[in-house]
Design a protein with these regions (language model features):
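Bacterial N-terminal signal peptides that target proteins for export
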Residues: 1-9
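Bacterial N-terminal signal peptides
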Residues: 8-17
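Sec/Tat signal peptide C-region and signal peptidase I cleavage site
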Residues: 18-22
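Acidic, serine/threonine-rich low-complexity disordered tracts
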Residues: 23-126, 164-266
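Hydrophobic, well-structured mid-protein blocks that either form specific transmembrane helices
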Residues: 118-160
């Protein structure tokens, strides 16, 4: 379960922005999808022998704060392995971002992870005016309207999916591991999905993944999000280097809108 929360956040990045160029519609979107106080819990299941085992969970929370005098959304992703998996690989990860409420662009990104005793800390300050990101490891050029791995989730929840047709390929840029990554997602369409939480009307998409420790490159991941104004991630399925994983939304609090995509609970 190496890179646990990073992997979960990477899974959630499928919600990132839509534009023919990462600079047109990608910029300037206002937040209408979430409010401070929202809390969402995802549960991770791991499968190697045909049986899914609960391996851990990740929570995503938001609050309203000021950062360097700017009104900001403080969004935090926390991941941990369950005690059973701690015996194999203990994970205690924390990712957070401060998002400018006026532009929905990240101001500050912090990564503080402990994975199997291997600790990583990275602190990134974004300067969109000069097109640079100053991280713990150096200064890097960034593209306009770039997102970090947490801000992307909240930014993209404000996108109108109805304007896209099946198989549309939608590019976006993301700053991750001190690099600008040029990615895309493919819009598949709308369908009903059954999760461990319940049955939903959903939107299905496939992200392009970067080949890494856990995930194979390409479009092998499937993601379902709620077909309502909240655009919550409901389910993620993907093969990994050994076996496959499934991630389900299991709890939510303080959504801005009723979860009207929910047909029934289990």
């Amino acid at each position: 379960m190496k890179h646990f929360i990073k992997s979960i956040i990477t899974l959630l990045i499928i919600l990132t922005a839509f534009s023919l160029k990462a600079g047109d519609e990608f910029c300037g979107i206002k937040n209408t999808a979430f409010v401070p106080g929202e809390l969402v819990t995802m549960k991770v299941y791991y499968n190697t022998m045909g049986l899914y085992i609960a391996a851990g969970e990740a929570t995503f929370s938001t609050s309203a704060e000021k950062f360097n005098g700017k009104p900001s959304y403080h969004c935090i992703g926390v991941g941990k392995s369950y005690s059973f998996f701690d015996n194999f690989f203990k994970v205690r990860d924390r990712y957070e971002t401060y998002i400018d409420t006026a532009t929905m662009l990240p101001i500050k990104f912090i990564r503080d992870v402990n994975e199997g005793g291997h600790k990583i800390y990275n602190n990134v300050t974004f300067n969109h005016g000069t097109g640079t990101a100053v991280s713990t490891n150096g200064v890097y050029k960034i593209s306009s309207c770039i997102q970090d791995v947490v801000s992307a989730i909240y930014y993209a929840r404000n996108i109108n999916f109805d304007k896209y047709k099946a198989n549309d390929k939608i590019p976006f840029d993301m700053f991750l591991d001190d690099e600008v990554n040029h990615l895309y997602l493919r819009y598949i369409g709308k369908e009903t999905v059954k999760t461990r939480y319940g049955k939903f009307h959903s939107i299905k998409i496939k992200p392009l993944l970067i080949k890494g420790t856990m995930f194979e490159g390409g479009e092998k991941m499937n993601v379902w999000i709620s077909d309502d104004p909240n655009h919550l991630v409901l389910r993620i399925e993907s093969p990994i280097s050994v076996g496959n994983i499934k991630v389900d939304m299991m709890d939510y609090k303080n959504l801005k809108y009723p979860l009207t995509s929910l047909i029934n609970t289990r």
